[in-house]
A protein has these predicted regions:
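Short, low-complexity N-terminal intrinsically disordered segments enriched in polar/charged residues
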Residues: 1-29, 33, 37-38, 49, ...
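Surface-exposed, charged secondary-structure patches
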Residues: 4-11, 40-47, 51-99
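Residue-level detector of alpha-helical recognition elements and their boundaries
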Residues: 27, 34, 45-47, 73, ...
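Short beta-strand segments enriched in hydrophobic/aromatic residues
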Residues: 35, 93-95, 119-120
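Beta-strand-connecting loop/turn residues
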Residues: 37, 84-85, 111-112
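Short beta-strand edge/turn micro-motifs at domain boundaries
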Residues: 99-129
Length: 130
């Protein structure tokens, strides 16, 4: 017997789609609303180090480039919701010339799901260095 998909799981999956499309189309407004004020993004570099960005730095990154041509490339690999308060999304998303593997952590604050953490690595293409 399959478990029913919870309404929160549908909402978090829709946020993951918005996230991928927001990256592709350079939609700063999507991330202004989606990201918690204490959002933190962590990249694993090719040399095994890490780079960090807070919400302001991430918004600047998104706004600082043009949208990519064509349709977004991404796949949502899994969505897990626990206790209707926390959720995790595992996905890959194309950010030409790279494909990134992302693990997104969401929290439900004041009844709204917000992106709290993003931990990612380069899956294909030139690795990030910092």
């Amino acid at each position: 017997m399959m478990d029913a998909v919870s309404p929160s799981q549908d909402i978090v999956r829709a946020l993951a789609v918005d996230y991928c499309e927001g990256i592709h189309f350079s939609r700063r407004d999507v991330f202004e609303k989606m990201c918690h004020e204490k959002f933190l993004m962590t990249a694993v570099t090719g040399s095994g180090g890490v780079q960090f960005w807070d919400k302001a730095a991430y918004l600047e990154r998104v706004a600082g480039r043009d949208a990519f041509p064509g349709q977004p490339g991404y796949e949502i690999l899994s969505v897990d919701v626990a206790g209707d308060e926390i959720a995790r999304v595992h996905l890959w998303v194309d950010v030409p010339p790279r494909r990134f593997e992302d693990h997104l952590g969401f929290v439900r604050v004041g009844g709204e799901w917000q992106l709290m953490t993003k931990v990612f690595r380069t899956l294909d293409g030139p690795v990030l260095e910092g």
